[in-house]
């Protein structure tokens, strides 16, 4: 006979516990689940006493401090307070399983979606927490409903909220593949063909030929005039998987979208994510975001409709200041020979049965080198299987993860060595456009820093976890070290970078020249893996000096105004959108390129009420930033001339951009890395422009700046010009220069003569891996070829020239010395023809 113990407690009703700390004591936990950690208890207590009535709250805990349990306890507390239903959202299905396992371990009741069922009744009745993944909630055909047809929720919690926000943006985006959706791709391509030719004929030809890296933005005025045709094309194909889930969100909001076209896909994405379309989230009584301590949360202001106050004032445990052990190693600082290729080659050769090694790379292209060396390359379909293999102890080969910096946990032996390979790459065309247009933007650089920090954190998942992190790739090293961008990292990461620089210097001092530099790098890793007491004490003492001295930023206010302006525009309140954007420009923007970016938004807001005024504003935007949309009329080419110029003073002016020699050297290393075959055209041409300025020439990119003319144009003393046509993306196995490429070169030579006259002195170069001109092709002018070896020779001489500058301050660097160094390294204008180029060979039939 079962005894009714509750009856013995007289007639009192036992109210469920609402204090999450007390609640934890009542749970039927498994024996492996011990007491709450101090950090968990501190955060839970503070939430219960001070924050539990707030609508919006960000909770920040160190990795490994148990934020999953904290989140589950908060939701159970709210359920016990009759403030359900409560929803726990993970960034992917893989992490749903992990959270469910945690809930089982701690005895917290939960429910999940069955394969074919609707929303569980246990969730709707406020009985159990519903654990699901972000794609299930945020899509145009969400089971939770959209707009006014949403399912009521009491509390929504986003776990790993930074990973979730990217997925939410993708929910509003249609991405149409050229290969799998050729019909829709072709129709949209044809629809905007004439408009895109006006924006840049060369780029449009590259897109038509299927170039992956080239992309263009459809002008907002063309999008507006042809939106009905776009809707017809999309509506007819709405059942296609690439359109199906986003279509309900787009179909009545098409004017608030922008279209980007590349050689491989078309992307239609919103200027601003309308999170209010998902009422289950936007109308929830409480919205809780879980975030790591190293992450910058400012983007929640625009992306999730949070107030700046909520973002600036998270709930966090102030002690300890840091968690886990990260040995950051920058091999190129140990020795120049420890470059990207050497590290990849050496570490792909290493075989170990004791721990896992991971490489995080930014693109599919970056995977190829690892693949050729026998590494395991993960795909979207295989990634979690490969991660499980690592956790089971299968450490046979290095595992490569492509462009995924979040939502991955690799604790303990599953990852003891992490290679962070090259600067993260934005996959979305909208993000790539903003990065290209505003490379110095605080917003863009914060997002890049955030991706890097997410990557760094993959291998250290707890207080006692440790991992060696190798940082390779000149652009990435520069971003992490440079004064201009290092400030965008958290205090924790900045300190770890400082430690990395210091141990590289220590290694240099103890470096035995008979030893291979890469062995020095490996010996550093061994010290950490073998738990060297000196290293552990040094790391701990350095990290304990950590001070969070972040300065106040205007980024919150800027993101708020961006969001408000877009909301006004989408509601048809054009005047308020215009005044909000004008205020943002006047009060918060200093940099001219960024001012141009915001002027373009202002021109777009003005377009519905005054086309003429919109064109004038777009002209102003384009003059400040030539990476933006070319206005429909009124842009003239500005010729370059060396009159009143002094080459040596120009070189000094270039050097003055940098606060010290180290900053200059970092910048030049990154530029020279981009001046390589295989680099995407935009980066290569930008690097060549920078090299022209470094060498004291007037340097221009006509094709980018006015959509006509050569890729690069330099002007030197006595108005001697160097004209460059760049083909950095041409395969190195290509046997000949095509008739089309020769014709393109001829057109650009003709443009130059039209602008500068037939008597202008100029050398004309094509940078391409082959010197053989197709029999069908012909050049109308004398053209010289720069191939790999000549390009490498030029880069070596530039690097040598910059190294020679190290002992000098600007004041000490005389004209004579500077001129001698330029001559020594063959960097005068006549050297380009004589030293770094060769004649082409015209193939016979």
Feature map (PLM): residue ranges:
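Conserved pre-motif I regulatory segment
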Residues: 2-60
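Conserved coupling segment at the C-terminus of the helicase ATP-binding
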Residues: 56-58, 62, 152-155, 160-339, ...
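Conserved Walker A/P-loop ATP-binding site and its immediately adjacent core
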Residues: 65-114, 136-139, 294-299, 360-367
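SF2 helicase motor core recognition
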Residues: 68, 138-151, 159, 164, ...
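Inter-Walker segment of RecA-like/P-loop motor cores
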Residues: 97-98, 103-148, 385-390
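Catalytic core segments in nucleotide and nucleic-acid processing enzymes
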Residues: 364-367, 383-389, 394, 422, ...
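Conserved RecA-like P-loop NTPase helicase motor core
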Residues: 389-478, 730-731, 765, 769
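Interdomain/boundary linker segments immediately adjacent to catalytic/signaling cores
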Residues: 618-621, 625-679
């Amino acid at each position: 006979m079962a005894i009714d113990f509750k009856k013995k407690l007289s007639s009192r009703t036992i109210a469920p516990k609402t204090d999450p700390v007390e609640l934890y004591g009542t749970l039927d936990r498994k024996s492996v689940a011990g007491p709450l950690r101090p950090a968990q208890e501190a955060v839970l207590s503070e939430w219960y006493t001070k924050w539990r009535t707030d609508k919006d709250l960000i909770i920040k805990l160190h990795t490994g401090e148990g934020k999953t349990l904290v989140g589950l306890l908060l939701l159970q507390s709210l359920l016990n307070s009759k403030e359900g239903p409560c929803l726990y959202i993970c960034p992917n299905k893989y992490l749903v399983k992990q959270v469910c396992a945690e809930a089982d371990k701690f005895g917290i009741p939960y429910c999940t979606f069955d394969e074919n069922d609707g929303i569980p009744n246990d969730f709707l009745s406020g009985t159990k927490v519903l654990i699901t993944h972000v794609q299930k909630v945020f899509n145009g055909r969400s089971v939770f409903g959209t707009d006014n047809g949403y399912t009521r929720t009491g509390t929504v919690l986003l776990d790993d909220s930074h990973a979730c926000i990217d997925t939410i943006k993708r929910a509003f985006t249609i991405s149409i593949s050229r290969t799998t959706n050729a019909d829709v791709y072709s129709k949209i391509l044809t629809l905007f063909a004439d408009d895109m030719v006006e924006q840049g004929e060369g780029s449009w030809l590259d897109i038509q030929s299927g170039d992956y890296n080239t992309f263009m933005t459809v002008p907002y005025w063309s999008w507006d005039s042809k939106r009905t045709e776009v809707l017809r094309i999309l509506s007819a194909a709405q059942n296609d998987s690439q359109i199906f889930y986003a279509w309900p969100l787009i179909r009545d909001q098409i004017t608030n979208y922008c279209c980007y076209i590349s050689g491989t896909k078309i992307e239609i994405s919103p200027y601003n994510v309308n999170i209010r379309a998902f009422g289950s989230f936007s109308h929830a009584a409480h919205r809780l975001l879980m975030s790591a301590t190293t992450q910058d949360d400012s983007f929640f202001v625009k992306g999730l409709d949070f107030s700046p106050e909520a973002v600036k004032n998270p709930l966090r445990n102030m002690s300890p200041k840091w968690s886990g052990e990260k040995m950051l190693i920058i091999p190129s600082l140990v020795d120049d020979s420890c470059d990207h290729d050497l590290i990849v080659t050496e570490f792909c050769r290493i075989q170990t049965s004791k721990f896992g090694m991971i490489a995080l790379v930014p693109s599919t292209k970056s995977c190829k080198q690892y693949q050729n060396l026998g590494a395991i390359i993960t795909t979207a379909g295989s990634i979690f299987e490969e991660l499980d293999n690592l956790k089971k102890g299968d450490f046979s080969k290095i595992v490569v993860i492509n462009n995924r910096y979040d939502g991955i946990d690799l604790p303990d032996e599953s990852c003891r060595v992490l290679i962070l390979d090259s600067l993260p790459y934005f996959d979305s065309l909208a993000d790539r456009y903003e990065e290209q247009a505003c490379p110095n933007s605080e917003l863009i650089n914060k997002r890049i820093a955030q991706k890097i920090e997410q990557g760094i954190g993959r291998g250290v998942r707890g207080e006692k976890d440790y991992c060696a992190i190798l940082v390779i790739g000149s652009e990435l090293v520069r971003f992490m070290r440079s004064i201009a961008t290092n400030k965008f990292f958290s205090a924790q990461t900045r300190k770890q970078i400082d430690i990395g620089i210091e141990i590289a210097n220590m290694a240099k001092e103890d470096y035995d020249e008979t030893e291979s530099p890469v062995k020095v790098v490996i010996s550093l890793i061994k010290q950490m893996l073998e738990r060297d007491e000196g290293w552990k004490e040094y790391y701990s003492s350095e990290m304990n000096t950590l001070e969070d001295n972040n300065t106040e930023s205007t980024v919150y206010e800027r993101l708020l105004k961006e969001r408000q302006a877009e909301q006004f525009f989408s509601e048809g309140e054009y005047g308020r959108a215009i005044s909000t954007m004008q205020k943002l420009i006047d009060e918060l923007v200093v940099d001219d390129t960024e001012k141009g970016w915001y002027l373009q938004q202002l021109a777009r807001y003005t377009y519905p009420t005054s086309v003429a005024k919109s064109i004038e504003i777009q002209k102003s935007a384009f003059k400040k930033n030539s990476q933006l949309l070319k206005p429909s009329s009124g842009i003239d080419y500005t010729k370059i001339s060396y009159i009143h110029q002094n080459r040596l003073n120009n070189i000094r002016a270039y050097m003055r951009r940098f606060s010290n020699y180290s900053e200059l050297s970092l910048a030049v290393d990154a530029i020279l890395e981009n001046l390589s075959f295989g680099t995407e055209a935009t980066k290569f041409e930008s690097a060549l422009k920078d090299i022209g300025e470094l060498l004291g020439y007037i340097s221009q990119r006509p094709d980018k700046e006015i959509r006509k003319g050569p890729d690069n144009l330099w002007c030197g003393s006595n108005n001697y010009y160097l004209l460059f046509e760049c083909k950095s993306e041409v395969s190195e196995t290509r046997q000949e220069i095509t008739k089309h490429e020769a014709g393109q070169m001829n057109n650009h030579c003709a443009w130059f003569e039209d602008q500068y006259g037939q008597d202008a002195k100029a050398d004309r170069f094509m940078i391409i891996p082959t010197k053989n001109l197709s029999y069908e092709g012909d050049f109308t002018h004398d053209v010289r070829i720069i191939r790999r070896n000549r390009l490498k020779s030029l880069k070596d001489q530039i690097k040598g020239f910059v190294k020679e500058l190290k002992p000098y301050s600007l004041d000490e660097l005389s004209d004579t010395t500077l001129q001698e160094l330029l001559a020594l390294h063959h960097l005068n204008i006549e050297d380009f023809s004589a030293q770094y180029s060769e004649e082409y060979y015209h193939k016979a039939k």
